[in-house]
Amino acid sequence: RQMCIRDRDKHDYGKGFYLTENIELAKEWAVCRPTETNGWVHKYELDISDLKILDFQKYDVLSWLAELMKHRDAADTKRYKVLSKKFIEKFGIDTSTYDVIKGWRANASYFYIAKEFVRDNVDTDILEELLSLGGLGIQYCIKSELAYSKLTENKKGSIRVEYSVFNDKYNQRDVRARENMHDLIESDANKVTNVFSTLF
């Protein structure tokens, strides 16, 4: 399985090595920070035999949000700090025994969903549809030494990424996603009945 990678120390699923199978998204992620410097995409192959993989796409979206809350704060209020602990206890998954975690990448627009959700502005019935609007891709997080040992770099596959081209694509994608998400949140489809604070 060939993957493109951008290394992160701390991110959505905690400390690990983050990859995607989508090379175009990898290019955008390589230059998504406002440093105005060109980036690189490195290609790796991951042998997934004998690896224990947690795929958040196979679980309720609330489990993914709980994992996100473990590592990133969606708000800094007392209410959020109290309720997020309860939310994680109820919907969280113990990821400590997994070699690889697969799931959505919580980029700016995805994190916008999380913030609106904890403010009780989003009904759980539209959460999955909201996630589909971002178009920001699926990522893999390499968590264990065993998984690291099964990574092989394609040294001839590195690609230089122009900041001026792909940072603009990244920003345009994010703007479109936020607009689409905002429209859905403000639509009649969002009943605002089954919300964050009602789930305990």
Model regions: which residues?
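Short, small-residue-biased leader/transition segments that mark boundaries at the very start
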Residues: 1-5
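A short, exposed loop/beta-hairpin motif centered on an aromatic-Gly-Thr core
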Residues: 13-18
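Conserved NAD+-utilizing ADP-ribose enzyme module
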Residues: 7, 11-12, 32-38, 43-200
